[in-house]
């Protein structure tokens, strides 16, 4: 491709409304342009990258044995009513009425459509397992679209759905998809983690997120320093090790009129925060226990996902208000604790190992110091209640935990029978009777992968693509003052044609521009391999090679340039 014939569309300045690096660089590199809130045109440079990511996803999915289909973006409301998600999904589901006064939606996902399709096409257990996928545009009417294509309203997604007659069969396909996703993100050259995840509202028995590590990520990712253990912070197990020490002091009731928070208590009484506990009151799951106390160490944070899964706690999790707490306990939020507590309590594992700790006395303006389990208060139920912190021991016993920010680019679920049951999707089983199909679903945000890659791989000059396979162009030819030097022009043209003949994805900057402008544009869009052709070097039979990723520069003989690139490209 010649730049003189190409829509490069680069910008020198960063648009004011672009908050994250990927949005800034995608606009500056001429990859996307906004059309409306959360809607973007993909320009040639952006589309080249998007299509290359899409092709990698497609190739690996096909290798896994999945079969590609394509389903409509527009879906009839009847399917959503049948699955009972018509009312549940909320305002993100864009609904409209056609000229025949029939309700439709723009598909944010395709569980309903694929379940209906397979129900109609598959009648026997002999036709299963089946794994169907598509790469297609989705639409979710986000209340606050932001960060460019990272969280837009329209996006490109690969969604796959598998159908089975047994949980064992589902697990086999799930394992295949887990490996396939690892292959995809490894091939993309990304630093990522496959993490155990909460199944959330989708439900199911197992779930993994694939997270690209980046400082701008919205999720906290926990992983071991010495093993493959990784989990979303919502699911990461907090291990407590060691033994509870014997009491060393007598429990004491202390006036603390100005200590409304843990920080107040620590500062005013010169306490160690690790020797304090905080008590949080939530709604109970049973009428006979309307309130439950959850107790964590003063320097730890309650993990609400873990708390919500406790059988004693109401789902969804709801914190009690000040009036409810005062009515039941007789003290305000800043003065609560396990001693003489009139409601059931559940304590975190780390709290169970504490001795001589400080806690609210359930009397406003008072705290107990030097409290000990079994001596001053009975040990309540113990559970994993907290978020892990950096340096905690890994649950698998190998190394310590690290925490980094991540961008979710893929998610796989074992759905079970949630949709097939609701939509009566059955096949004839081996025994001749109808059997409800068991489902799995597997998604990759293809357009989000592009943004996540840029978030992870960039510098002050622009984008550094993590893999040659997804760069908009693999090689750039940058001729210095080509229109003033016949030798430069002739060699540049010959090299360009040779690379085209070898099917190398090459961009030839044949513009009448200053070298500084040419370098800035090529480095901004992230072309990994640059061949710089200058008059002085050519006179010596040489050209200059520059690597965008490493910054390496090398002078090579012009006769060797094709062999040199053959060894470097996609290496």
From Swiss-Prot:
It is found in: Cytoplasm. Its main location: cytoplasm. It is an enzyme of class 6 (ligase). GO terms for molecular function: aminoacyl-tRNA deacylase activity; ATP binding; proline-tRNA ligase activity. Keywords: Aminoacyl-tRNA synthetase, ATP-binding, Cytoplasm, Ligase, Nucleotide-binding, Protein biosynthesis. InterPro entries: aa-tRNA-synt_IIb, aa-tRNA-synth_II, aa-tRNA-synth_II/BPL/LPL, Anticodon-bd, Anticodon-bd_dom_sf, Pro-tRNA-ligase_IIa, Pro-tRNA-synth_IIa_bac-type, Pro-tRNA-Synthase_IIa_type1. It holds the Pfam family tRNA_edit. The keyword Transmembrane does not apply. Its EC number is 6.1.1.15. PROSITE patterns: AA_TRNA_LIGASE_II (PS50862). One of its GO terms (cellular component) is cytosol. GO terms for biological process: prolyl-tRNA aminoacylation. Disulfide bonds: none annotated. Catalyzes the attachment of proline to tRNA(Pro) in a two-step reaction: proline is first activated by ATP to form Pro-AMP and then transferred to the acceptor end of tRNA(Pro). As ProRS can inadvertently accommodate and process non-cognate amino acids such as alanine and cysteine, to avoid such errors it has two additional distinct editing activities against alanine. One activity is designated as 'pretransfer' editing and involves the tRNA(Pro)-independent hydrolysis of activated Ala-AMP. Belongs to the class-II aminoacyl-tRNA synthetase family. ProS type 1 subfamily. Homodimer. Consists of three domains: the N-terminal catalytic domain, the editing domain and the C-terminal anticodon-binding domain. This is Proline--tRNA ligase. The gene is proS.
